[in-house]
Amino acid sequence: MDIVSLWRQVENPLSYAVPFFFVLVAIEAVMLRADERREGKTGYSMIDTRTSLLMGSGALMFMLLIKIVTLFLFALVWTHLAPWHIPAGTWWSWILLFVVVDLTWYFNHRFSHRVRIGWAAHQAHHSSEHFNLGTALRQKWNPWSEAIFWLPLPFLGFEPWTIYVAFGFNLIYQFFSHTETIGRLPRPIEVIFNTPSHHRVHHGSDAEYLDKNYGGILIIWDRMFGTFQQELHTPTYRLTTPVNTHNVFKLQYREYGNIIADVKQAPRWLDRLGYIFAPPGWKPRRLREAEKQATNSTAEGKITATQ
């Protein structure tokens, strides 16, 4: 394969979409300001939106770096290891690719919520207390897990450049799911596709909304794998532990620092691995039991004091 010509073929649809994103963010902000005057509500904060735009700009650069690294790896896999090559010039191959890319997005997204080292990268996207088109641009600066979950695609025969194109369109679709200005859509759409209603649930920190609705374009994966949740009420948009900062570097890397601190104080290797690869919030059994005993003792003390 001619790597130079391959590189020239790799176009990122996001590069063309970004100017339209900015225009749509401005339009939505004006609409929500008008709602604020009528209802006393607003979906935008100037400093919050500025933070999201800074994070989105940085994410584009880091995505370019990931593309440079993975392009050559994927080209080698596709050229030397793929048992067959899927033609890129047919309509059915693109439909198949879009479905497969969306499925890999689902598993990568689920990994990013259920494995702490993955959550350390992804949590920045969930750090806003607002939910709007600007929030869609609040992207992570370390998209390493995508490269891992994409690796099977060139092995399955998809040309590397087509993977980047399909992923770009996947992200463009998801941009429009970050809004409160659109209610529920007709049921056939809600059943098949990831809609603003479904994605509002995903961004909620309410107990019933946690770790739900991972789909990118299609919501059928969540229905198939048991992670679907209907929107029941307006979600609480934030991390379960609010970050209280707009510093983009803290938002991007704070959880890595928390992991390092937990690993350093852990006495056993098993506990250290748990702090890295277990779900966010995991603690060793001895700490959970100690906290439970402390809670029970506090409750007993309150009962005694009231007698």
Segments the model singles out, each with a brief description of its role:
Residues M1-E11:
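Short, strongly hydrophobic alpha-helical membrane anchors
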Residues N12, Y16, T42-S57:
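Loop-to-helix transition at the N-terminal end of transmembrane alpha-helices
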Residues T234-Q307:
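Cytosolic-facing loops and C-terminal tails of multi-pass membrane proteins
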Residues S57-I66, A88-Y237:
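Membrane-embedded catalytic scaffold of the fatty acid hydroxylase/desaturase
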Residues V25-R50:
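Membrane-interface helix-loop junction between the first two transmembrane segments
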Residues F20-L32, F98-L103:
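Central hydrophobic cores of alpha-helical transmembrane segments in multi-pass inner-membrane proteins
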Residues V69-I95:
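Juxtamembrane/interfacial segments at transmembrane-helix boundaries in multi-pass membrane proteins
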